[in-house]
Amino acid sequence: MVDLSLVTDLSRAWIAPAFIFAIVALGLNLQWGHTGLFNAGVAGFFGIGAYIGAIFTTPAIGPGPGGPGHLGLVSLFAIFTPYTVLVGFLVGGIAAMVVSGLVGLLIAIPTLRLRADYLAIATLALGAIAVESIRNSDPVTGGVYGILRIPRPWEFGQDVWRTELAYAITAGVIVLLVFFLIQRATRAPWGRALKAIREDEDAALALGKNTYFLKLQAFVIGAALMGGAGALFASLLRVAVPDSFTPALTFSIWTMVIVGGSGNNKGVIVGAFALTFLEYFTLRAKDWFNLSSFWDIRIFYVRLIAIGLLLIALILFRPAGLVPEPRKVTKKPWILFGSR
């Protein structure tokens, strides 16, 4: 007999978040692992996508005793279809990707022509600016109250486990699609050009590659993936609040990429599942092992210590990550010289 409460808990607290963070990790891996672009504002793109997705799936709420209200566009879809939430979910996800991609484009255009550290500074600033802008845009985002009661595309009433499992499966299907597309792209000549830029941009320039445009493409696509994942995350939590998108989130995503294996699309998915399970385990450890109230708060610090120890162990024993990037060497080196 399957424990439905366990299915509900695993789907909501581990599997679905792991799939969502895997999408973010794939986006960051495209930027950093394949192209060498340092993005310190992952949480900013993620938060922008979360709010765009939330706005498209919720009705507008005016100011009142419960808060300043927020913008909502889901009612617009009632004119065309009875499936307003599903359409809002799809349109909101696409809009989240578009807006996050445009923000990434605006940041990348002036900074990618400069030294790499300017991009890091600009994206770091984005993370702070995005959160403060969300917090102070009361009529649109709900301010510090955020956007509440965000619906899911699939609801099964009293069968909570069905609702949670269906959403986890939805996120899993999206991850498979994103992985397939990125895997194909990074194995194509376009992806090999990105790796050439990562290894030696001057050499790529000498071979006639438009390195600026290639870096721009990689950064914008990565930012768009982060925004789309943010929309999924808001629907998972059913709420979007500014405090969910702090620099700690950026650090977590970077840890997933490093632990899994930077430059390996499969590896970063493994890293996302590993780090998300570590968080899930520490959240549930107190109940599983009947720990005393002494661990109520301290268990969260134990998680940070565990992540730190994991990173140190990887640096010492597996610096390339759990699933390292494969290094391919041609079996016919004479091809490079035009002779047999």
Predicted regions and their residues:
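Transmembrane alpha-helices and adjacent helix-loop boundaries
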Residues: M1-R340
